[in-house]
């Protein structure tokens, strides 16, 4: 399975094409719209979320509520485009109109300046439009399709925020994936500890008043993943490496860890390695899950625990200093519409890219033309692993 996305932040629409989805997968536009709605939620979101109510149009690859095995095309209209018809026009326009929303004061921490250097733009809006997090709309749409595949295979996925701008959120021990999903869904800030809810919301309000932004750490957990996805035989076959690339490809994400992650550098081997157990009922399990469900670049049957760190959003309402690319004189950076934080929304994006990567890996290992073949192949593999 593979996909491409296209579209600009203020262009007419966003598009994704997905290839390799088996025939027979139940899929409706509403399945995708539910995920798009989640992405637009969360405390601290800006005015763009009031303008856009994202809804997908499926224009290929689905008939009578099921996938056909052909490429799937997804489109989401940008309602805000009506205010940008001249600025984002495909055809050439007058120079006076071109300069109307030209960006020449790049924002520190954004793709503006380096994108202009790379592609030789004199208007940095070209960098901004495609590098905008608006693109993640389609990654969530693609992820919604991937989640339907995972659900058919009894694989469940959830995310929650564990660090909010330096404030660590205590997570109760022993929560299942379903419990994490339920608790995070009930929280406006996607945390599982409801006692911290009002504190975090007040903190976001203060950051907004300060004209600043905050980042944090998001944890995605996946249950029901069969052992043996990924491989140790080549560096680019390791599934944890593929997931790391997928997570860090999300706008503003700067790092990823699995299980205890970077804490492993402070612990002894006897404190980190997960002892192997076996029972007639469950087959092979681990006493702990410090490695986050991975050994040798492969899934080991335990829940996957993946954390991604998101830097603060680079657009500040009290902008940092930059340089005018025409005069090279010091100048305050451009201010575009932004949020004090997008952690809850980013969690949905992270969940989506993890789901897409896992679905792709499953279809690589259990190559199938239709869902019945896929479900039978995965069930057979699970039985084999349990009785190994």
Curated annotation (Swiss-Prot):
One of its GO terms (cellular component) is cytosol. Reduced FMN (FMNH(2)). Its cofactor is FMNH2. It comes from the Bacteria. Keywords: Amino-acid biosynthesis, Aromatic amino acid biosynthesis, FAD, Flavoprotein, FMN, Lyase, NADP. The keyword Lyase applies. It holds the Pfam family Chorismate_synt. GO terms for molecular function: chorismate synthase activity; FMN binding. One of its GO terms (biological process) is amino acid biosynthetic process. It catalyses: 5-O-(1-carboxyvinyl)-3-phosphoshikimate = chorismate + phosphate. InterPro entries: Chorismate_synth, Chorismate_synth_AroC_sf, Chorismate_synthase_CS. NADP(+) binds at residues 39, 45. This reaction introduces a second double bond into the aromatic ring system. Belongs to the chorismate synthase family. Homotetramer. This is Chorismate synthase. It comes from Streptococcus suis (strain 05ZYH33).
């Amino acid at each position: 399975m593979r996909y491409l996305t296209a579209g600009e932040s203020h262009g007419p629409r966003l598009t994704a094409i997905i290839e390799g989805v088996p025939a027979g997968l139940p899929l409706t536009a509403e399945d995708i719209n539910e995920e798009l709605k989640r992405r637009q939620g969360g405390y601290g979101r800006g005015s763009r979320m009031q303008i856009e109510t994202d809804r997908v149009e499926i224009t290929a690859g689905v008939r009578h509520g099921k996938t056909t095995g052909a490429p799937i095309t997804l489109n989401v209209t940008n309602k805000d485009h009506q205010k940008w018809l001249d600025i984002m026009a495909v055809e050439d326009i007058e120079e006076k109109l071109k300069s109307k929303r030209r960006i020449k004061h790049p924002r520190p921490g954004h793709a503006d300046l380096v994108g202009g250097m790379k592609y030789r733009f004199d208007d940095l809006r070209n960098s901004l439009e495609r590098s905008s997090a608006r693109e993640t709309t389609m990654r969530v749409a693609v992820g919604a399709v991937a989640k339907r595949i995972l659900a058919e295979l009894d694989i469940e996925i959830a995310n929650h925020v564990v660090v909010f701008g330096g404030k660590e959120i205590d997570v109760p021990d022993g929560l299942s994936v379903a419990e994490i999903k339920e608790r995070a869904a009930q929280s406006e800030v996607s945390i599982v500890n409801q006692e911290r809810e009002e504190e975090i919301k007040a903190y976001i309000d203060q950051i907004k008043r300060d004209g600043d932004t905050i980042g944090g750490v998001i944890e995605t957990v996946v249950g029901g993943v069969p052992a043996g996805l990924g491989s140790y035989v080549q560096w680019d076959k390791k599934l944890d490496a593929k997931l790391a690339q997928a997570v860090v490809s999300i706008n503003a994400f700067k790092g990823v860890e699995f299980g205890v992650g970077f804490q492993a550098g402070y612990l002894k081997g006897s404190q980190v390695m997960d002892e192997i157990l076996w029972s007639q009922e469950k087959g092979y399990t681990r006493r702990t899950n410090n490695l986050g469900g991975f050994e040798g670049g492969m899934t080991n049957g335990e829940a996957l625990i993946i954390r991604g760190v998101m830097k603060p959003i680079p657009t500040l309402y009290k902008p940092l200093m930059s340089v005018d690319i025409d005069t090279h004189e010091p100048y305050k950076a451009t201010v575009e519409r932004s949020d004090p934080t997008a952690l809850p929304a980013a969690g949905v994006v992270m969940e989506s890219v993890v789901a897409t990567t896992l679905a792709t890996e499953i279809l690589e290992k259990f190559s199938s033309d239709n869902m019945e073949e896929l479900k039978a192949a995965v069930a057979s593999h699970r039985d084999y692993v349990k009785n190994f």
